[in-house]
A protein has these predicted regions:
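Intrinsically disordered, low-complexity regulatory regions in eukaryotic proteins
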Residues: 1-82, 86-142
């Protein structure tokens, strides 16, 4: 096997490995985005369920299986992150609108990442085929 053949095979193998790592990273990012999207959908559903005249004795989840009982006044607002860790109280309709927009943006990002994943996967398959063909031709020469 010539030095050029070895170098080319090593380059292809490295590229395949880099692509595999990138695909794994994209999968992890998409999974995290999906968790965020589901959390936002649940929040939208919860906010939408608050009646305009408020609610008495509503159970508000704090996390870790803990809830607090509270009264929700009529025409209440929700405190929402508006960016750069700045939070502001917004009317429920506006908070729902903001969350809906964020959910749509996450879906767009997830779709772009899935397209990128498919492109990398296609390239990786092509490189793997070239690698296998070169290995087969080298073995045939011996």
């Amino acid at each position: 096997m010539s030095a050029v053949d070895k170098a080319e095979l090593q380059r292809i193998a490295q590229q395949v490995e880099l692509n595999r790592q990138r695909m794994e990273s994209i999968e992890q990012q998409v999974a995290r985005l999906e968790q965020i999207r589901l959390e936002q959908l649940q929040t939208i559903e919860t906010l939408s369920a608050i009646p305009p005249n408020g609610a008495k004795g509503a159970m508000i989840p704090l996390g870790s299986g803990v809830q607090i009982v509270a009264d929700i006044p009529p025409k209440t607002g929700a405190v929402i992150d508006i960016g750069s860790r700045v939070q502001a109280e917004k009317p429920l309709d506006e908070a729902i609108e903001i969350l809906t927009k964020r959910t749509e943006e996450i879906l767009e990002l997830m779709n772009k990442m899935k397209i990128e994943f498919s492109s990398i996967e296609e390239t990786t398959i092509s490189l793997a085929n070239v690698f296998n063909e070169q290995i087969a031709s080298l073995q045939a020469e011996q």
